[in-house]
Amino acid sequence: SRRRLLLDYLNQKGAACGYINLGGNVLCLGAKPDGSSYNIGIQRPFDDEGAAMLAVSVTDQTVVSSGVYERYFEVDGKRYHHILDTATGYPYDNGLLGVSIITDESVDGDGLSTTCFALGLADGMALVESLDNTEAVFITEDYELHFSSGMGTKIPYQVME
């Protein structure tokens, strides 16, 4: 995978830990130099880019997010985002604002975040629950957070005020 190639390259160069932010894809290599986990913010939709809705604590994992707030335009007060339903050609309108996937492989997270968004909350969550070493946070239009079963136990998190 691309993540494995990047990690191999960083290891060859002597990197034991690191943090790489590729927009909606954050890769954490190992733990921080002090041994603690990285705290990765998950953006509050339609807020300033730096405003986090929650933070997840990860070590040697990736956090990948997809959402309607990343790329969109408005016409007559209606937002049109970039995640399109292939059956209609229009943006999905399924009650979701965003999905964040926490997994060991960046390439898995990238595909899963968009797939889970397209599936919607119930089916997307069912898919995540069927996968090993994969957790998720879904944000619905009412700004409610929906967590997969391993969130809080396998992946610590903190909701921001």
Each PLM stretch: what is its role?
Residues 1-161:
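Mature catalytic core of soluble alpha/beta enzymes
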